[in-house]
Amino acid sequence: MAEAAAPGTTATTSGAGAAAAAVAAASLTSIPTVAAPSPGAGGGGGGSDGSGGGWTKQVTCRYFMHGVCKEGDNCRYSHDLSDSPYGVVCKYFQRGYCVYGDRCRYEHSKPLKQEEVTATDLSAKPSLAASSSLSSGVGSLAEMNSGEAESRNPSFPTVGAGSEDWVNAIEFVPGQPYCGRTAPSCTEVPPQGSVTKEESEKEPTTVETKKQLCPYAAVGECRYGENCVYLHGDSCDMCGLQVLHPVDAAQRSQHIKSCIEAHEKDMELSFAVQRTKDMVCGICMEVVYEKANPSERRFGILSNCNHTYCLKCIRKWRSAKQFESKIIKSCPECRITSNFVIPSEYWVEEKEEKQKLIQKYKEAMSNKACRYFDEGRGSCPFGGNCFYKHAYPDGRREEPQRQKVGTSSRYRAQRRSHFWELIEERENNPFDNDEEEVVTFELGEMLLMLLAAGGDDELTDSEDEWDLFHDELEDFYDLDL
């Protein structure tokens, strides 16, 4: 009996479940169901059935508008951009430098004038009215959603289901405050582009802005075009930018002058590169500009001849110890003595250009801290004639004075003091030709002694600095050292 009753019980239970399911189905038929698209689907959220959709087919797919809808023909939303009142304009095209060109997925069009924008808004009204008529079919569902939102957030105002702009609801944009359907009307946070009363008072008037050049048009293209409140200048023939003020003659002449100066510098650089690129070093026989190591692509310009050498080779030649000074200071080809070598990125031949290069080299050296002076902690053998900067940690410059104290021995300190005394005596009391040989001998002895003093002081002498100092002594005292 128990075994026979069990199937009956089961049948009774299943019949009750079927009746409940029928009642639930009948109640659901009165509420039209709308399948919301999945926000994380990356497309229109459609399934395999491409024929369905209903009212959604009249709504343009937002993913298709951005060119990233992965549903394709199966998307339940419309892929017809002609139904969309607004197109997605490429922001890079508006700035004037879209690299995709005609292959860009976004719209390449000029900004609309105010009249065209007004006409577009008027033509968009019928489509909004048609979309609002569709909202009656989903009214109950919208009311349910808004009721649930109101119960969760009682302070938020409820947005009616029959709003005309529900299709064009504000989307989330990174960097801007989000305004959803159940969120406040964003009055607390001013949207991007809005200004407060105080800011509007500080802004210049229309008359003032019309006198100022548009900064966007000056560097490329202004997205506002003819509707820009600022003045679009005339194009410069030199740089091609809209930077010439139509009325201000002083501004026009100043800009043209600066453009001409920049053009002349560019031409000088072009000529320098042209005469430099094929120069071959006379020692290693390599094209200097084609060396494998970029740091070796520099010339060593000799002060008294025009033979070509790379900086590495000529410095190696002049640092040889097995020859006397007269040999290593002379050019390897013509044997003309040059007191120093000027490093240069470009090849220079003219004497005036060499003088400019030497002056620039000295100025560059004067901006570098002297390693011998060491911010007042050391002692520089060149004293006030040093080409490097003698400055203390607080920025104060060293006052010119005689160097009386050495670093390694009392004898060298006395000889250095005597050296500077001879210089002061030469400046105050010019001597005759009979005493010139004695002074020449003294100066030569002092220079040789100072050059040989680096080992005891654990300092490495700068060849360029000694060469420049030697040349300055010869020019100042008219001596041949």
UniProtKB/Swiss-Prot annotation:
<feature type="zinc finger region" description="C3H1-type 1">
    <location>
        <begin position="55"/>
        <end position="82"/>
    </location>
</feature>
<comment type="pathway">
    <text>Protein modification; protein ubiquitination.</text>
</comment>
<comment type="subunit">
    <text>Interacts with p53/TP53 and CDKN1A. Interacts with TERT, modulating telomere length homeostasis.</text>
</comment>
<keyword id="KW-0833">Ubl conjugation pathway</keyword>
<feature type="zinc finger region" description="RING-type">
    <location>
        <begin position="281"/>
        <end position="335"/>
    </location>
</feature>
<dbReference type="Pfam" id="PF15815">
    <property type="entry name" value="MKRN1_C"/>
</dbReference>
<dbReference type="InterPro" id="IPR017907">
    <property type="entry name" value="Znf_RING_CS"/>
</dbReference>
<keyword id="KW-0862">Zinc</keyword>
<protein>
    <recommendedName>
        <fullName>E3 ubiquitin-protein ligase makorin-1</fullName>
        <ecNumber>2.3.2.27</ecNumber>
    </recommendedName>
</protein>
<dbReference type="InterPro" id="IPR018957">
    <property type="entry name" value="Znf_C3HC4_RING-type"/>
</dbReference>
<dbReference type="GO" id="GO:0000209">
    <property type="term" value="P:protein polyubiquitination"/>
</dbReference>
<keyword id="KW-0832">Ubl conjugation</keyword>
<keyword id="KW-0808">Transferase</keyword>
<feature type="zinc finger region" description="C3H1-type 4">
    <location>
        <begin position="364"/>
        <end position="393"/>
    </location>
</feature>
<keyword id="KW-0677">Repeat</keyword>
<dbReference type="Pfam" id="PF18044">
    <property type="entry name" value="zf-CCCH_4"/>
</dbReference>
<keyword id="KW-0863">Zinc-finger</keyword>
<comment type="function">
    <text>E3 ubiquitin ligase catalyzing the covalent attachment of ubiquitin moieties onto substrate proteins. These substrates include FILIP1, p53/TP53, CDKN1A and TERT. Keeps cells alive by suppressing p53/TP53 under normal conditions, but stimulates apoptosis by repressing CDKN1A under stress conditions. Acts as a negative regulator of telomerase. Has negative and positive effects on RNA polymerase II-dependent transcription.</text>
</comment>
<dbReference type="GO" id="GO:0008270">
    <property type="term" value="F:zinc ion binding"/>
</dbReference>
<feature type="zinc finger region" description="C3H1-type 2">
    <location>
        <begin position="84"/>
        <end position="111"/>
    </location>
</feature>
<dbReference type="InterPro" id="IPR045072">
    <property type="entry name" value="MKRN-like"/>
</dbReference>
<feature type="zinc finger region" description="C3H1-type 3">
    <location>
        <begin position="208"/>
        <end position="235"/>
    </location>
</feature>
<feature type="region of interest" description="Makorin-type Cys-His">
    <location>
        <begin position="236"/>
        <end position="263"/>
    </location>
</feature>
<dbReference type="InterPro" id="IPR041367">
    <property type="entry name" value="Znf-CCCH_4"/>
</dbReference>
<dbReference type="InterPro" id="IPR000571">
    <property type="entry name" value="Znf_CCCH"/>
</dbReference>
<dbReference type="Pfam" id="PF00097">
    <property type="entry name" value="zf-C3HC4"/>
</dbReference>
<dbReference type="InterPro" id="IPR013083">
    <property type="entry name" value="Znf_RING/FYVE/PHD"/>
</dbReference>
<dbReference type="GO" id="GO:1990830">
    <property type="term" value="P:cellular response to leukemia inhibitory factor"/>
</dbReference>
<dbReference type="InterPro" id="IPR031644">
    <property type="entry name" value="MKRN1_C"/>
</dbReference>
<dbReference type="GO" id="GO:0003682">
    <property type="term" value="F:chromatin binding"/>
</dbReference>
<dbReference type="GO" id="GO:0061630">
    <property type="term" value="F:ubiquitin protein ligase activity"/>
</dbReference>
<dbReference type="InterPro" id="IPR001841">
    <property type="entry name" value="Znf_RING"/>
</dbReference>
<dbReference type="InterPro" id="IPR036855">
    <property type="entry name" value="Znf_CCCH_sf"/>
</dbReference>
<dbReference type="Pfam" id="PF14608">
    <property type="entry name" value="zf-CCCH_2"/>
</dbReference>
<keyword id="KW-0479">Metal-binding</keyword>
